[in-house]
Amino acid sequence: MGVVIGIDVGGSTTKIIGVENKSIQSPMFVKATDPVTSLFGAFGKYIYDNGITLPEIEMVMLTGVGSAFIDQPLYGLPTAKTDEFLANGLGAKYTASLENLIVVSMGTGTSFVKVEGPHIQHIGGLGVGGG
């Protein structure tokens, strides 16, 4: 099984992680004013800094407001998009090892997500801010 790359293309910052053997690897943050530039810059820097080759990448998962600008696979790799609130809920549940929690995501926008076991619900706020 290869590396899954997760990328949150935000309005001001792109966040990227790798997941290998169910372990989160080397979170990275990249700032750029253009989401496509930020995405490709973060992706290139991440795989270079971590010594990951393209054939080692199993999947690229995208989320965030900037992911709307991407309509084709990254470098021919399997690429999919997921809802940002779902990603926030699942990520927090996994990281915290909790079944029930409220997730507050504070960036240029602030959102609230409720996690109750397998159910994840956006309960308020926005994922997109004003800068």
Please name every model-derived segment.
Residues 93, 118-131:
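Glycine-rich phosphate-binding loop plus the immediately following alpha-helix
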Residues 3-41, 120:
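Short glycine-rich, Thr/Ser-proximal phosphate-binding strand/loop in the N-terminal lobe
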Residues 39-46, 88-92:
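Generic hydrophobic alpha-helical segments
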Residues 29-32, 43, 48-84, 117-122:
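Short beta-strand-loop/turn "lid" adjacent to the catalytic site in phosphate-handling enzymes
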Residues 70, 75-104, 109-119:
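Conserved phosphate-binding catalytic cores of ATP/NTP-utilizing and phosphoryl-transfer enzymes
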Residues 32-39, 81, 85, 126, ...:
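Generic structural signal for well-ordered, non-membrane alpha-helical segments
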Residues 8-13, 65, 105-109, 126-131:
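A short acidic Gly-Thr/Ser loop motif
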Residues 2-8, 57-61, 101-105, 123-125:
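Short glycine-aspartate micro-motif
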